[in-house]
Amino acid sequence: MSNDQIKIIQNVVSGLHYAGVSEECKNNQEKANSKVRYIALGADHGGYEAKEIISRFLKNLGYHITDVGTYHRDSVDYPDFALKVAKKVASGECERGIMIDGAGIGSSMACNKVKGIRAALCYNLKTIINSREHNNANVLTLGGPLHNPEELCEMVKVWLETPFAGGRHWKRINKIMAIERGN
């Protein structure tokens, strides 16, 4: 997909943004959109090959990768690795996380059990962009076998480079955090 096509999708997904936002929201948005360098990366056996492809790709782009496993193709349980990725992000050790399993569904469920995590299962560029612009997702979950290597790399690159739009979306993020606090 060309850069022009990606821009068109970003413009369609982003919609209208409110001009008037509080100073606190502006500061939080700057933090949300600062250059991401540290990535937690994990997979179960179904996502192992995709994890290795993504790891090499991101290292070549200069990202610092914390690989939490798995380190082989033997059968393992995705919640174990999803929890490791989510904890690295929630603790601040890593700025974002990527978790890959066979379909991405179970990993998304597991990651979202960790306080402070907004994991998004994405399957195309539109959902990738939406997850960042509207939801400020800090963990991406993917179904590794569902995508070819080029798609995986493009999706990850766009996800890492797409900024949070802020504006009206802050209110929604705050509502998610209120649910998380039990309110």
What is each model feature region?
Residues N3-N11, L16-A19, N28-K35, G42, ...:
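C-terminal binding/interaction regions
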Residues I100-A119:
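Compact, glycine-rich, soluble single-domain proteins
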Residues H64-S75:
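A short beta-strand-loop structural module common to alpha/beta enzyme folds
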